Structures are given as C-alpha cells and as structure tokens.
A protein has these predicted regions:
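Short, well-ordered loop/turn elements at secondary-structure boundaries
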Residues: 159, 172-175, 226
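Short secondary-structure capping/turn segments at boundaries of alpha-helices and beta-strands
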Residues: 163-168, 218-220
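A cross-kingdom feature strongest in bacterial/archaeal respiratory oxidoreductases
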Residues: 185-193, 243-246
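C-terminal non-catalytic interaction/assembly regions of soluble proteins
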Residues: 1-157, 180-185, 192, 200-226
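Phosphate-interacting basic helix/loop segments used at nucleotide- and nucleic-acid interfaces
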Residues: 157-163
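Eukaryotic N-terminal low-complexity, Ser/Thr- and Lys/Arg-rich leader segments
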Residues: 140, 280-281
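Helix-rich interaction surfaces within compact, conserved domain-sized segments
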Residues: 213-280
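Conserved phosphate/anionic-ligand binding catalytic regions in large, soluble enzymes, centered on
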Residues: 165-185
Length: 281
C-alpha cells in the first residue's frame, strides 16, 4: 500500500478484515481465531513501543490467523480479498488469486530413557547396547562473577551498537541473543545497563504474559566473561517458532537489531573516543 498515511490505512484495513471475519464466523457457528497477527512492514511494527512516530507513505501488510477449522481460515481469506478489492485506496498486490488455508505443523521434542531404545546394526538388534542411565548432578552450578562495578559518577548514554556486535536466532519457541563487546573494557557498562528488564521492555510485544512481571520471567541472562559477551535466552517469544509461527520473523533473527538501539550508560571518555571514530556504528 502506498500514499499518504499508509500505515494508518493499512492498520484500519487489517482490523476491518478481522472484524468482518469474526462476524461471519459467529453467523455460521464457528469459534473465534486462536491467534491473529498484523505486521506493517515499513512502519516499524517490529519495534513495538520503541517505534518512531512518523508518517510513512509505503508499507507492506502481513496479516495472518490461526483457527481450529480450515473453514474458519477460508472465511478470513475471503474477507481479505473482498475488503482488499473494495475499500482501501492505494492498495496493490504482488500475488494473483486467493491464498489457501494451510495446516500448522509443530515440532514436539522430548526426552526418554536410553534404556527404552534398542540399537540395530545391519537390521539385527545389538544385544549389548543397553546404556546405564546417567543421573543428574546435584552439584551447585558455578556461575562467573559479575563484572567490576562502574566507578565513574558521570555517565552518558550511548547506543549499544557503538559498543558491541549482536546476533540472534531461534531454538524452538525460544530465542537466543548474543552480545559481544567490541572491547573488553566495555563489558561492565553493557552488563549493568542491558539488564533482563531492559531486554524484556524492548521485546515485550513479542513475549508471552499478561503483565510485565510475567514477561520478565521469560528472560534469562548469561555472562561469558572470557569473550566479553552476554547471552540472553527468551522463552515463549516466537509465537510457536519456525513453521508453527505466523509471524514475519518466526526465528527472531531481527531481535538483536532491536537491542542495538538500547542506551548504555558509559563514561564520558568512552563516548568521546567512540564519537571520534567514524568506522563504528
């Protein structure tokens, strides 16, 4: 969609499609959608509360839904075509025809005792394949000490991207975000600014939970002092993850990019040094 205030028109169209779909679902006796998704690519919908308030003239609408019955998705897709053709000015499409309902396929992984599994070699069971079941260790986990506290009283904000590299990806319905400081002396500053709560606030629109405190429970932070790095694990954050998710970024590949905008409080000398280096950022 393109034209003035495209993001507002796109959002209104998307909400209207779901409203019309729900009215039809109710009329034919079908239950509501189990999950819906509206993403306006180009209007910073991935940024949540941290999106910049600006009017854009061009967006791509990515709209999706889940329903227990394929007929429910059929109704949704019919409304997409009907309202798309009849209502919004400036709407264009790159695919001809109507999309089709597709099943949601999930991966279910679980552990079973090794003794439950037989080993076969050349089609014959290997009798000596029984493995003694290992026991979980009761030893207390040894975690690295936190970096030294920052002694400077006067601190100024600097974006994380000036201090670190970042990359993210998925593990099922969980996401990992790795932060590696550009220099070891930056680790303390990053560690004490980029807390679990700071990460939760940046990604709260993706994380499951009805309250911020519930969402915070899904965020864990792990320190890797040997490489001046931090890893964040966020659970229940990908809408099912992989092919089970209806989101544009089902693998959390852009989560690290969202964090790179985070303000990190640093000593003035670091800010002066980095601001003078045009190669960083």
């Amino acid at each position: 969609m393109y034209g003035e205030d495209s993001e507002k028109k796109a959002d209104y169209l998307s909400e209207s499609i779901f409203k019309a779909s729900r009215n039809t679902l109710q009329k034919v006796g079908l239950e509501d959608f189990t999950e819906t998704s509206i993403e306006l690519i180009g209007a910073e919908s991935q940024y949540g509360e941290f999106a910049r308030n600006q009017s854009v003239r061009e967006v791509a609408i990515k709209i999706a839904a889940k329903h227990r019955d394929a007929a429910g998705i059929g109704i949704f897709l019919k409304e997409c075509v009907g309202l798309g053709l009849a209502t919004p000015p400036g709407l264009s499409g790159f695919q001809g025809g109507r999309a089709r309902p597709s099943p949601v396929i999930r991966l279910f992984s679980f552990e079973i005792p090794k003794s439950f599994v037989n080993t076969y070699i050349d089609g014959q069971i290997f009798e000596d394949s029984q493995v003694e079941q290992s026991q979980q260790s009761n030893k207390q986990k040894v975690l690295p000490d936190a970096p030294p506290k920052i002694k400077d009283k006067l601190l100024v904000p600097l974006k994380l991207k000036k201090l670190a590299y970042a990359r993210s990806g998925d593990k099922g319905n969980s996401a990992n975000i790795g932060i590696i400081c550009r220099r070891p002396e930056y680790l303390s500053y990053v560690y004490y600014s980029l807390t679990e709560r700071a990460v939760m606030e940046r990604l709260s629109h993706f994380i499951s939970g009805d309250s911020l405190e519930e969402k915070l429970k899904h965020v864990s932070r792990f320190l890797l002092p040997g490489i001046s790095a931090i890893n964040f694990l966020i659970t229940d954050v990908l809408g099912g993850g992989g092919i089970a998710s209806i989101r544009n970024d089902a693998q959390g590949k852009g989560f690290a990019q969202l964090l790179l905008d985070s303000p990190i409080m640093v000593s003035q000398w670091i800010a002066d040094e980095i601001d003078g280096n045009e190669d960083i950022g």
